[in-house]
Amino acid sequence: MIIPWQQLEPETLLNLIESFVLREGTDYGEDEKSLEQKVANIRHQLERGDVMLVWSELHESVNIVPKEMFHS
């Protein structure tokens, strides 16, 4: 199920994004980014609609996925 990120409390959204960034360990190449930069990057992707928050009933967890990977 898609979760509209705009409906979340700002602190909840921040916690979800931080958890995702720390869990994924995204590779940014030679220029390592700070946690704040990575969080801002994911937030911008949410705002642009490039990624979305998805609730998995099977895993009882929220994940951030590229919109192309989610088939509604």
Curated annotation (Swiss-Prot):
Protein family membership: Belongs to the UPF0270 family.
The protein, known as: UPF0270 protein plu0398
Pfam families to which the protein is assigned, alphabetical: UPF0270
Protein's organism: Photorhabdus laumondii subsp. laumondii (strain DSM 15139 / CIP 105565 / TT01)
NCBIfam families reported in the protein's UniProt record: PRK04966.1
InterPro entries registered for this protein in UniProt: UPF0270, YehU-like_sf
